[in-house]
């Protein structure tokens, strides 16, 4: 696998592949990779001739008092895992390469509406940072297809909307959430959990599953939500949000809506865990 921090190196290699009529897939990451990321790379390798990955801990998407400095950097292990999964080109830029004028002077991309709710409300500016870095990476790599995990459901919709609104010629594919045996969604932030917290963490998935089951049985959204919040609190969580939304627009769920998604974010110790479940009523 070729690894470079420089934009020109990435563009030169991708141009060489394109000159031969070959297709390019892209998997952007922040590193500290787990099996969910590796699954994205393997799926990408099935779809395209070449897979490009990136590792960049993006300062623009972290708010004040968030874990930018603490976020684990594990480049050597990540590089080995990406190579084994089939990636051929790895982009590892520094913040100075991505934002040479600094964050305050950086042109940014903002996806209105869908970026302002749920995680966007809890983490102001987060999705501006996500949309900006993903747009920049798309312009650098210029892939045919890009792969993202469904665990970050709102992020996936923000990126799909950006691609559609800006007429970017890139197919976006979401891959099902990869889970540990306990049901806990794999996340780079699971490493913040103590052993006791990790034992309690599957309660988040159980609460979401119970909500969906209740809604399918005709129980009101309000009732299932209150019961789920109570179960999470009893398990040691501090819920951030727990909501039922229209699966495609993230508008608040209406009685007539069939395609729904439950989205949850909750703190467990130092970790902020997110999860979701899309289902039809």
Curated annotation (Swiss-Prot):
Q: What InterPro entries does the record tag this protein with?
A: Cyt_trans-like (IPR004821), Pantoate_ligase (IPR003721), Pantoate_ligase_C (IPR042176), Rossmann-like_a/b/a_fold (IPR014729)
Binding sites annotated in the UniProt record for (R)-pantoate? 61, 155
The protein's annotated pathway: Cofactor biosynthesis; (R)-pantothenate biosynthesis; (R)-pantothenate from (R)-pantoate and beta-alanine: step 1/1
Residues at the active site:
37
Which EC class heads this enzyme's classification? ligase
One GO cellular component from the entry? cytosol
Subunit annotation: Homodimer.
Primary role: Catalyzes the condensation of pantoate with beta-alanine in an ATP-dependent reaction via a pantoyl-adenylate intermediate.
Indicate what this protein is called per its UniProt record. Pantothenate synthetase
**Protein species of origin:** Shewanella oneidensis (strain ATCC 700550 / JCM 31522 / CIP 106686 / LMG 19005 / NCIMB 14063 / MR-1)
